[in-house]
Amino acid sequence: MPTVSGSENKTIAGFMFNWVKDNCNLPTDFTYNFNFTSTGSSISFVPEKSIGIYEWDVCGNYEAEFPFSIIIGVSATDDASRMKPYIIFDTIVEKLDEVTAKIWDYNSGFSINIDSTKTVLKIEQISTPVVIRQGEDNSIDVQSLFKLYYEKEVH
């Protein structure tokens, strides 16, 4: 699968980080990180690999996919705190499903523009959340994979 330029990768990654942070009703008492995880209550956005182009048209327009992870870290001192990442992921997925439904309802006129040439087609969760780290201090990191699909129009 062909990939896009490094600058387009940066644009898309930065857009998605800020969009998820600003639009998914996430907790305000968490630290937000781009491309790294930290200790304590944190939500990290990690691009998984380069954006892949999966469809071209005769004019040079294309559709591409951007895989990314969200990693939620908490101090898990009891069952309720161990469940917090999963509840946050549910909130994120509900918002993504709602937005994707609006995008695909052509009568709504709703769209998310990344910039003047790129428009979001769909954002979806592609894996269930899993614990990827458990610290000796009872902290845990829970990760889920997502994918943004977008189209770029060549002007």
Residue ranges and their predicted role:
Residues 1-35, 51-155:
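Charged, amphipathic alpha-helical segments and their flanking helix caps
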Residues 40-51:
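Charged, often glycine-rich, active-site loop that binds/positions anionic groups
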